Amino acid sequence: MGKRDAIGKKHHGVIHAVRERNDMDYRKLIGERHSVRAYEDRPLSDDVAAKLEDCIAKINMESGLHIQLIRDEPKAFDSALAHYGHFSGVSNYIALIGRKSPDLDERCGYFGEKIVLEAQGLGLNTCWVALTYKRIPGVFRIGEGEKLTVVIAVGYGKTQGSVRRSKSAEEVSNCTDSSPEWFLEGVKAALLAPTATNQQKFFLQLCDGGKVRAKAGFGPCAKMDLGIVKCHFEIGSGKTDIWCY
């Protein structure tokens, strides 16, 4: 699957196929979502887990990814690395797996964030995790030609997280006072996207014809961050088939 096919089409409809929410619901969830690292010692309810599994199954079908929910498995976050990352109580996580390709990281970011927002709507908390966890053999399935990119911790947070510092809209886009409202709203939502170490190394350029070019900067997980940013931008702007390359 090429980059244009992966992110450039109308994949915003995926999230509507999962649950009956409207754009305003998802904009609200974007504002409510904050990264959480400390979780209650409490299993996912069967009802919530079933809804999350259903969301993942639909997104896998749409995206061609092999994302998996891992439940009641605390060993991945019971390590020196996890403690260094200030994680505690994590026993459920989502493994983002897919076939190796140049755009795998971006697709995992884009579709993984859809799952994150759905989890938020189910009363769960999440945190993207790139390095500070341990791979436990046998708990997820990696097919031939596939790779694990990152995981997302998920569960009932001890807190709802907190607002982090953010760059300005002018630092991450070419917006001006005369930019269309949909572009400004998209940039606003993009600034709420979780990025590695809160680096926000992306740039959104409004081009001729109402198209948008999204560029990843240099840094850890920059391509994955770009996929997350695109997900947020589409929801905030209310537009989908807008990307140019």
Regions picked out by a protein language model, each given a short descriptive name:
Residues 4-245:
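Acidic, surface-exposed loops and disordered segments
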